[in-house]
Amino acid sequence: MNTYFLFVLLGFFIVLVIYLTIDPNIEKFGIEYSVSYPNIEEIKNKLTVNKNSYFEFFKLLDAQARNIKFSFKDFQEKYNSSILEIDQKEKNNFDRFYKDVVNMIPLKKRHQILIPNLKIAKFSGIENDYPHTHSDIIFFSKSVFENDLSNYQSLENNKNLLSLAKTLIHEINHIKLRQNPTMYDTLFNQWGFKSISPQYLNQTLPNNIISRIRINPDELPDYRFWVWRNKSIPLAIYSSTDITSISDTIIISVDWNNPKKYTYLDDDDDFIDYFKIHVNHYHPNEILAEYHSIYFMELTKQLTDTDIIKTEAYKLLKKTL
């Protein structure tokens, strides 16, 4: 009887240990992370055919910054002509690059910052050639394919390509958030952000700020504005009404209690001390994407600035992953 009881007890403990040690995300370990390259017509359909799209959000300065006439037809023609074919060699190079990015990330962590099927497009002559996203597609400029990855060998000890990998993770996060726009609202609230409607902003902020807010495809179509700690509204706005590029931008902090008053966001010591970043910090979506790219660098032991990972904001992010 005692022997039987001991065997039962031993069996119970074995089952308990197995239960406690199996990762709840074990089913995600077998995910294969692939890359696909939509054809040009598919990209055009997602980017320019639907009038309830990117261009619906354009203001006069958004068109001016892109050197486009303010009409849907001109927007459509400009963006359609920017999309380029990706040849087989370029696809092979990007495939190898992405495979190396995936393999750098510990197996159990990959699902936290990657998506199963990455869609990539190539473009030239729009958005200042900055990487960006539309729908479920990440857009990279032709220089990425024709220069950065033209003779791809390895990520190892290549700072430029590691920077590209970090950018890729940033853009992937925009895709993930677009698929589930409210998935990080609890985190944003913990960071001190509270969502405010565009209608409220239009009624409250002076026109010389509202008319200069810069559109960003990565935050669309579910763009929301946010106030931080009931004291400031971070915004990216055009530096003047006489701009010639989307880079003619300043990042400001609008006083929540006095909307006619603003300072540069980098001069908001409380904000900067809390997040510890000076780029991509004008919107919680951008902070989130930047933190994911920093998390990638931490996971792959490439991180040099350790101050960020010590912040409360970054630690709160990691708890959500």
Predicted regions: what is each one?
Residues 115-122, 145, 161-166, 173, ...:
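Non-catalytic terminal regions of proteins
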Residues 1-48, 52-55:
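Intrinsically disordered, compositionally biased terminal peptides
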Residues 189-321:
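Metalloprotease/metallohydrolase-associated module, dominated by Zn2+-dependent proteases
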Residues 71-143:
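Auxiliary, metal-adjacent structural segments of Zn-dependent hydrolase domains
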Residues 123-169, 173, 178:
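Active-site scaffold of zinc-dependent metalloenzymes
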Residues 106, 173, 177-181, 294-298:
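Sec-exported extracytoplasmic/periplasmic mature domains
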